[in-house]
Amino acid sequence: MIKLRLKRFGKKKEASFRIVACNSTSRRDGRPLQELGFYNPRTKETRLDTEALRTRLTQGAQPTDVVRTLLEKGGLLEKIERPSIAIGKAKLEKEKKAKAKTKEEENEGSKTESGSNEAES
């Protein structure tokens, strides 16, 4: 599978990144199939080769999370709302509590039904 990811270069503590297309099993700084752009996190500078990126995306290349946000900012991908981890945990807890309540109500309902059936017999 082809991934669109960041390849690190630059001095120590002054990293810059190239946006590259590479095989998903290759190393982070290994030889890429194609260089598609540039990103400097210190100056927030981003350069994208839009034509090459579009062709790679249509071929089925999967961007990593960071590259996806860069492409969304560049207008190449539609923005997808991704819930934060904290919101997801809170939702799960609410769902668990709701399921527990429904199970308790079902258990109480089945007990009353079985009791009324025995009384009728």
Swiss-Prot record:
<dbReference type="GO" id="GO:0003735">
    <property type="term" value="F:structural constituent of ribosome"/>
</dbReference>
<keyword id="KW-0689">Ribosomal protein</keyword>
<comment type="similarity">
    <text>Belongs to the bacterial ribosomal protein bS16 family.</text>
</comment>
<dbReference type="InterPro" id="IPR000307">
    <property type="entry name" value="Ribosomal_bS16"/>
</dbReference>
<protein>
    <recommendedName>
        <fullName>Small ribosomal subunit protein bS16</fullName>
    </recommendedName>
</protein>
<dbReference type="InterPro" id="IPR023803">
    <property type="entry name" value="Ribosomal_bS16_dom_sf"/>
</dbReference>
<feature type="region of interest" description="Disordered">
    <location>
        <begin position="88"/>
        <end position="121"/>
    </location>
</feature>
<dbReference type="GO" id="GO:0005737">
    <property type="term" value="C:cytoplasm"/>
</dbReference>
<dbReference type="InterPro" id="IPR020592">
    <property type="entry name" value="Ribosomal_bS16_CS"/>
</dbReference>
<dbReference type="GO" id="GO:0006412">
    <property type="term" value="P:translation"/>
</dbReference>
<feature type="compositionally biased region" description="Polar residues">
    <location>
        <begin position="112"/>
        <end position="121"/>
    </location>
</feature>
<dbReference type="GO" id="GO:0015935">
    <property type="term" value="C:small ribosomal subunit"/>
</dbReference>
<keyword id="KW-0687">Ribonucleoprotein</keyword>
<feature type="compositionally biased region" description="Basic and acidic residues">
    <location>
        <begin position="90"/>
        <end position="111"/>
    </location>
</feature>
<dbReference type="Pfam" id="PF00886">
    <property type="entry name" value="Ribosomal_S16"/>
</dbReference>
